[in-house]
Curated annotation (Swiss-Prot):
InterPro entries: Cys-tRNA-ligase (IPR015803), Cys-tRNA-synt_Ia_DALR (IPR015273), Cys-tRNA/MSH_ligase (IPR024909), CysS_C (IPR056411), Rossmann-like_a/b/a_fold (IPR014729), tRNA-synt_1_cat_dom (IPR032678), tRNAsynth_Ia_anticodon-bd (IPR009080). The lineage of its organism: Bacteria, Bacillati, Actinomycetota, Actinomycetes, Bifidobacteriales. One of its GO terms (biological process) is cysteinyl-tRNA aminoacylation. This is Cysteine--tRNA ligase. Monomer.
Length: 546
């Protein structure tokens, strides 16, 4: 039988130190973020000056990660990076749900120990996060390491009169404990539901928010759980805080409690872990759009019913669609992370996943990946050319040290507008166009040192903006991955483009040598019309994507 234990089974990165000086940028005064509970974009003010606490619901590690999972991770990674660029100390908690009905069922079907399966897929998720440049969380707690926290929280809810223990004919606790929704008048505030005893009301709200399906087509967030369908419930809306074990549950998937042997309900896990690491109230609770109801609605209710304040702001990332429809069974494994990475570089996949504002649906298509590859080519081309012109690149330390106050105003305005990544990306490419213009003028400038300083300033700004989105090609993990960031490896598409343009430039050079300037101009005009800028210099002609 499992044992209630103190939280010891989790990963911790560097925790923010209270001794570290805080230098919040002036740009932070303009930050506005959406709040699901209020349905409004509002000015962000941290609960503690200079610090931000964020809890994001992580994966239920039952199977391999798919693009929908990682989209949410990338979205909140960008949110986190913007807070860091603004100068805040950020405590970022992302949990791992490693005990769950589906984990138990799938492990049994595969002849595996449930905990071994959970750990195996947890590592797959970690590998996907790392490969796609998602920063490791400050704390990554596993549900199984926090049973005592959950039991304590449930006891507080019971003591406050907002839950009930189911007993058998002899008056002994069965292990089933439910939250009493009728006792909590604030239930429904997150998703703006009316208090009603009709279960259809909650179902209707859930339906309006879209289907809760994963890549296998299964109902991931609202599974048919015998505990939640039990006739022992006082109200159809009541949900399980603790669940009695099924006959098929392994002995090591059961924990002893004052209200019987069993295992936790899904919602209580996040309430317990967020309170453990972020305390009484924190700034932001995030997760995928599917989690608004019932998970986050239930989580908010039980946390407050235990006597603790809820998160000050709730943020939800929209899901990934294909041909206008949310990922579903019909897409099979085509959207699994390994299958996508087998065909595209990690930088390109990250760019595609983070290419729109987090609340916007993300349409996943071949065209989106082609556009992401083109973006990479434009970015890497400028960075490489600028580095050659300057004789070197700004260091990673210098790039990371650029404050939000020193970034281009249009980029800051976009990021402060509820993390409008589309606008921020447009600002980056505006800066790249300006930088390419400076590079084209470099050879003709009499004030060469001033000209180089301007190029360097443009290069530093571009890389700092990219870094804020987790996309600086000269940062980890892109450099270690051997991507084209360092010029040592190119995508097949870029290599083909390079070869075709080189052939055209050679033909143009031959025409100029033969004084056939009409043909030379014709070649240049054709390349320009195709979006390729040609620049002639003492060492020959170079090209860049406009």
């Amino acid at each position: 039988m499992g044992n209630s234990q103190e939280p010891q089974d989790f990963n911790i990165s560097v925790m923010p130190s209270s001794l570290t000086p805080v230098h919040v940028a002036k740009a932070a005064e303009g930050l506005n973020l959406y709040d699901t509970a209020s349905h409004q974009v509002s000015h962000f003010v941290p609960l503690k000056p200079g610090e931000v606490g964020i809890y994001v619901c992580g994966a239920t590690v039952q199977s391999s990660p798919h693009i929908g999972h990682i989209r949410a991770a990338v979205a909140f990674d960008i949110v986190r990076r913007w807070f860091l660029k603004l100068g805040y100390k950020v405590t970022f908690v992302r949990n791992v749900t490693d005990i769950d009905d589906k984990i138990l069922v799938k492990a049994a079907a595969a002849g595996q120990r449930w905990w071994a399966r959970a750990y195996y897929y947890e590592r797959e998720f970690t590998e996907a996060y790392n490969t796609l440049g998602v920063l490791p969380p400050t704390v990554e707690p596993r549900a199984t390491g926090h049973m005592s926290d959950m039991i304590d929280l449930i006891q507080r809810i019971l003591d406050n009169g907002h839950g009930y223990v189911v007993t058998d004919a002899d008056g002994k606790p069965t292990g089933n404990v439910y939250f009493d929704v009728a006792s909590w008048p604030h239930y429904g505030e997150l998703t703006h539901q009316k208090q009603t005893s009709e279960v259809d009301e909650a179902a209707a709200v859930a339906d309006r928010m879209g289907p809760s399906v994963d890549a296998t087509g299964a109902d991931k967030y609202n599974p048919v759980d015998p505990a939640d369908a039990s006739p022992d419930k006082h109200d159809p809306r009541d949900f399980a805080l603790w669940k009695a074990p099924k006959d098929t549950d392994p002995e090591d998937a059961r924990w002893s409690t004052p209200f019987g042997v069993g295992r936790p309900g899904w919602h209580i896990e996040c309430s317990a872990m967020s309170h453990r690491y972020l305390g009484d109230g924190f700034d932001i609770h995030g997760g995928g759009l599917d989690l608004r109801f019932p998970h986050h609605e239930n989580e908010m209710a039980q946390t407050c019913a235990a006597g603790y304040p809820s998160a000050a702001r709730w943020m939800h990332s929209a899901w990934v669609t294909a041909k206008g429809e949310k990922m579903s069974k019909s897409l099979g494994t085509g959207l699994s992370v390994p299958s996508v990475l087998a065909e595209h570089s990690a930088w390109v996949v990250r760019y595609a996943l983070g290419s729109v504002q987090y609340r916007s649906m993300l349409e996943w298509s071949d065209q989106a990946l082609v556009e992401a590859q083109a973006a990479y080519d434009r970015v890497s081309n400028f960075i490489e050319r600028a580095g050659v012109a300057l004789g070197g690149q700004p260091s990673r330390e210098e790039v990371a040290a650029v404050s939000a106050d020193d970034l281009p105003a249009d980029f800051v305005a976009a990021m402060n507008d509820d993390v409008n990544v589309s606008g921020a990306t447009a600002a980056i490419f505006t800066a790249i166009r300006s930088g390419n213009t400076l590079l084209s003028q470099l050879a003709d400038r009499a004030d060469s040192e001033t000209a180089k300083a301007e190029v360097r300033e443009a290069l530093l700004a571009v890389r700092a903006m990219l870094d804020t989105l987790g996309l600086d090609p000269l940062a980890e993990p892109w450099v270690s991955a051997g991507g084209a960031a360092d010029g040592t490896a190119e995508s097949p598409e870029h290599a083909a483009l390079e070869a075709l343009i080189a052939e055209q430039l050679n033909a143009r050079a031959e025409a100029r040598k033969a004084k056939d300037f009409a043909k030379a101009d014709q070649i240049r005009d054709a390349l320009t019309e195709a979006g390729i800028a040609i620049e002639d210099g003492p060492q020959g002609s170079t090209w860049s994507l406009k």
